[in-house]
Amino acid sequence: MSQMEIKLTAKEILDKDFKQSMRGYNQDEVDKFLDTVIQDYEAFQKKIEQLERENELLKQDLKKQTERPQRSQTVTTPSAGSTNYDILQRLSNLEKKVFGSKMYE
């Protein structure tokens, strides 16, 4: 999306004085100024729409990123109790193989 340059600030709009001709304000000057204001509003609207889309994409990415670690942690992290039990079971099996039935006599 091409960047549209913003031509007016709020202060410039507030401080704008139109020169008066014999029948009131110079119509061409007022029309040009209003055209510039309209262009700025259009530029603001496009920028807002772009930022809203970008914001939505970032929210979706963040949601995906926060879901991934939770799933992997629950799958890969066994509880401490089951890990200790597995170690004790392996140790017991190893003792039986190394020492045989002598241990239990």
UniProtKB/Swiss-Prot annotation:
Belongs to the GpsB family. HAMAP family: GpsB. The keyword Coiled coil applies. Divisome component that associates with the complex late in its assembly, after the Z-ring is formed, and is dependent on DivIC and PBP2B for its recruitment to the divisome. Together with EzrA, is a key component of the system that regulates PBP1 localization during cell cycle progression. Its main role could be the removal of PBP1 from the cell pole after pole maturation is completed. Also contributes to the recruitment of PBP1 to the division complex. Not essential for septum formation. Its main location: cytoplasm. This is Cell cycle protein GpsB. Residues 61-70 have a biased composition (Basic and acidic residues). Keywords: Cell cycle, Cell division, Cell shape, Coiled coil, Cytoplasm. The lineage of its organism: Bacteria, Bacillati, Bacillota, Bacilli, Bacillales. It is found in: Cytoplasm. InterPro entries: Cell_cycle_GpsB, DivIVA_domain, DivIVA_fam. PANTHER family: CELL CYCLE PROTEIN GPSB (PTHR35794:SF1), CELL DIVISION PROTEIN DIVIVA (PTHR35794). SUPFAM superfamilies: BLRF2-like. It comes from Shouchella clausii (strain KSM-K16) (Alkalihalobacillus clausii). Pfam families: DivIVA (PF05103).
